[in-house]
Amino acid sequence: MSEELTLEERKVIYRARRGLKEIDVYFDPYVKNYYLTAPASEKALFAELVAQEDPDLLDWFMEVSEPPQVELKQLIQKLKHYVHG
């Protein structure tokens, strides 16, 4: 990563490291390949996503339940597409 990261970008990247393989499999590729070049609106949405609790994230990624915002659901689908094609 670049030394030119903003404080907010550093925080989001740090928070994206969950230590939970089921979530990291989606977050890691996105952070490494797409996050820094994403539009500001998508970065803000990803920041909101990584601020959620692990049990909620697991339910959303495994489609047990849906996130409260349609935008979060769309971002989750995008992250899943990056991994599964």
UniProtKB/Swiss-Prot annotation:
Main location: cytoplasm
Compartment annotation: Cytoplasm
Biological processes per GO annotation: succinate metabolic process
SUPFAM superfamilies attached to this UniProt entry: YgfY-like
Gene3D superfamilies according to UniProt: Flavinator of succinate dehydrogenase
Signal peptide: none
Keywords linked to the UniProt accession: Chaperone, Cytoplasm
InterPro entries the UniProt entry points to: SDH, SDH_sf, SdhE_FAD_assembly_factor
UniProt key word Nucleotide-binding: no
Protein's UniProt keywords contain Cell membrane: no
Top-level taxon: Bacteria
GO cellular component, as recorded: cytoplasm
Protein family: Belongs to the SdhE FAD assembly factor family.
Record's function text: An FAD assembly protein, which accelerates covalent attachment of the cofactor into other proteins. Plays an essential role in the assembly of succinate dehydrogenase (SDH, respiratory complex II), an enzyme complex that is a component of both the tricarboxylic acid cycle and the electron transport chain, and which couples the oxidation of succinate to fumarate with the reduction of ubiquinone (coenzyme Q) to ubiquinol. Required for flavinylation (covalent attachment of FAD) of the flavoprotein subunit SdhA of SDH and other flavinylated proteins as well.
Matches recorded under PANTHER family: FAD ASSEMBLY FACTOR SDHE
Name of the protein this chain belongs to: FAD assembly factor SdhE
Organism, as annotated: Acinetobacter baylyi (strain ATCC 33305 / BD413 / ADP1)
